[in-house]
């Protein structure tokens, strides 16, 4: 079972300029990169810029990754990477609220964008019904298929835990390994992007003591875990794969292990280092006075 999973499921989207306890102004607001990616699955320029005005951080880019990718199209993902029109704004004054926000991602939109203008979108459109009839593309049923963490459903993701939507949009479902190699060293706290609510997104590593930058840098752990028992009505066998990429690679009547569905996970406060939104308040290299930040884990 894969042990790399992004569990940043919730974003609190509230904008206010009346108070600004967590200003991100001046951090990554003057960046421009244009570099040709000669990977055989890309062969295009990766172009992105980050600027700002008085209120917002502004991203403009073409969504082309600036690093090596897997082979696309492939048998489980028949889509070709193509340039996108990425124009997004993020408040410079994000507001931390006490209530967990609404789930986002998947068909509802990106939860965050990486520095290179590639979106983070951990959710999928894959669904199963109670009878085990599943689809990887706009399926019906209440059981949400996870992109990572199991081998029953193959979305054709690459070494960056990413794949390509039918629109040609390359996007991350999990740890953007080769982007991290570009941005940081083997074990450092690395800012990889910005969430829809304006807070920064880091990946894998953080300080062992949240408010102590002199503490060791460690792999931060989520507070989500697999449930000990499946939910009532959960299908345990794939009876039919009705459509979407990869339908030819799965045989009916195979088991669906725990971890294949979003509903297989539960949040346990204090289990790991992070909260229900996979974030915490603490100091970072860019924010030595502290800020709320999300983690890709």
PLM features per residue range, with description:
Residues 98, 179-182:
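Short loop/beta submotifs within extracellular cysteine-rich repeat domains
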Residues 3-16:
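Sec-dependent N-terminal signal peptides
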Residues 197-199, 209, 213-297:
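Extended, compositionally biased non-globular segments
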Residues 115-118, 166-179, 287-297:
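Extracellular/lumenal glycan-associated surfaces
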Residues 115, 119-161, 244-280:
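Short, flexible domain-boundary/linker segments around small modular repeats
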Residues 94, 124-126, 174-176, 205-207:
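A mature extracytoplasmic/lumenal domain signature
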Residues 187-200:
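Short amphipathic alpha-helical linker/capping segments at the junctions of internal repeats
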Residues 17-154:
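Solvent-exposed N-terminal domain segments of exported/luminal and surface proteins
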């Amino acid at each position: 079972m894969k042990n790399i999973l992004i569990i940043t499921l919730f974003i609190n989207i509230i904008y206010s300029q009346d108070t600004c306890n967590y200003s991100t102004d001046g951090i990554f607001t003057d960046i421009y990169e244009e570099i040709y990616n000669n990977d055989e699955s890309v062969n295009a320029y990766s172009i992105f810029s980050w600027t700002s005005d008085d209120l917002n951080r502004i991203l403009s880019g073409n969504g082309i990754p600036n690093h090596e990718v897997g082979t696309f199209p492939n048998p489980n993902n028949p889509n070709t990477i193509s340039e996108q029109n990425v124009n997004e704004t993020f408040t410079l004054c994000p507001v931390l609220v006490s209530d967990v926000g609404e789930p986002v991602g998947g068909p509802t939109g990106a939860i965050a964008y990486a520095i290179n203008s590639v979106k983070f979108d951990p959710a999928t459109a894959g669904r199963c019904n109670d009878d085990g009839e599943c689809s990887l593309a706009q399926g019906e049923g209440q059981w949400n298929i996870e992109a990572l963490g199991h081998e029953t459903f193959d979305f054709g993701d690459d070494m960056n835990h990413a794949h390509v939507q039918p629109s040609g949009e390359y996007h991350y479902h999990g740890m953007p390994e080769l982007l991290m190699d570009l941005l940081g060293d083997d074990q450092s706290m690395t800012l990889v992007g910005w969430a829809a609510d304006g807070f920064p997104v880091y990946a894998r590593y953080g300080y062992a003591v949240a408010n102590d930058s002199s503490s060791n840098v460690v792999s931060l752990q989520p507070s989500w875990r697999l449930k000990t028992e499946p939910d009532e009505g959960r299908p345990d066998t794939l009876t039919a794969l009705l459509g979407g990429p990869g339908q030819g690679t799965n045989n009916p009547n195979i088991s669906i292990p725990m971890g294949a569905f979003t509903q297989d996970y539960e949040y346990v406060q204090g289990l790991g280092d992070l909260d229900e939104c996979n974030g915490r308040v603490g100091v970072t290299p860019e924010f030595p006075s502290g800020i709320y930040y999300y983690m890709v884990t």
